[in-house]
Amino acid sequence: MEFTHLNESGRARMVDVGGKDDTNREATARACIKMNRETISMIRDGQMKKGDVLSVAQVGGIMGAKRTSDIIPMCHNIFISGVDIEFKLHEEEIEISAVAKTRGKTGIEMEALTAVSVAALTIYDMCKAVDKGMVISDIMLIKKTGGKSGDYERESI
């Protein structure tokens, strides 16, 4: 397997995607944030002093996707045609999923992964006053379509 972000000397480089064809691309990512049951109840009931946690986390995740190339060194600045973030509240965790879409020369996996990561960090920030033991985990790519390398779907979680 070849690392495309390394040049012949083994040093980092940004891959040249100029000769690639534009294709429709989509990526789905997931993250979890574990917390106390009381914290989940406060989020569900809108009792956090900082505001509507999930609405702010949704906007934060979208903003994160848009800024991916600013924080991931070799990531291309791409046109994002859409990002959607969903939250599933469980007894002691929130499952975050993001779907990001583009039509371009390079994939959108990093934008989807950044979206769920920033959404989880936003939840942490908004809830840390009542629950310092929260754990962000299981950040992963679930599915990607489009591009030269083909489609990918995680078999199990």
UniProtKB/Swiss-Prot annotation:
Annotated keywords: Lyase, Molybdenum cofactor biosynthesis
Signal sequence interval, chain numbering: none
Enzymatic class: lyase
InterPro entries linked: MoaC (IPR023045), MoaC_bact/euk (IPR047594), MoaC_sf (IPR036522), MoCo_biosynth_MoaA/MoaC (IPR050105), Mopterin_CF_biosynth-C_dom (IPR002820)
GO terms for biological process, alphabetical: Mo-molybdopterin cofactor biosynthetic process
List of residues binding substrate: M74, C75, H76, M110, E111
Top-level division of the source organism's lineage: Bacteria
Pathway(s) where this gene product acts: Cofactor biosynthesis; molybdopterin biosynthesis
Transmembrane segments: none
Any Pfam family the entry gives: MoaC
UniProt catalytic activity: (8S)-3',8-cyclo-7,8-dihydroguanosine 5'-triphosphate = cyclic pyranopterin phosphate + diphosphate
Active site as annotated: D125
Record-stated family: Belongs to the MoaC family.
PANTHER family in alphabetical order: MOLYBDOPTERIN COFACTOR SYNTHESIS PROTEIN A (PTHR22960)
Subunit and interaction comment: Homohexamer; trimer of dimers.
Protein name: Cyclic pyranopterin monophosphate synthase
Gene source species: Peptoclostridium acidaminophilum (Eubacterium acidaminophilum)
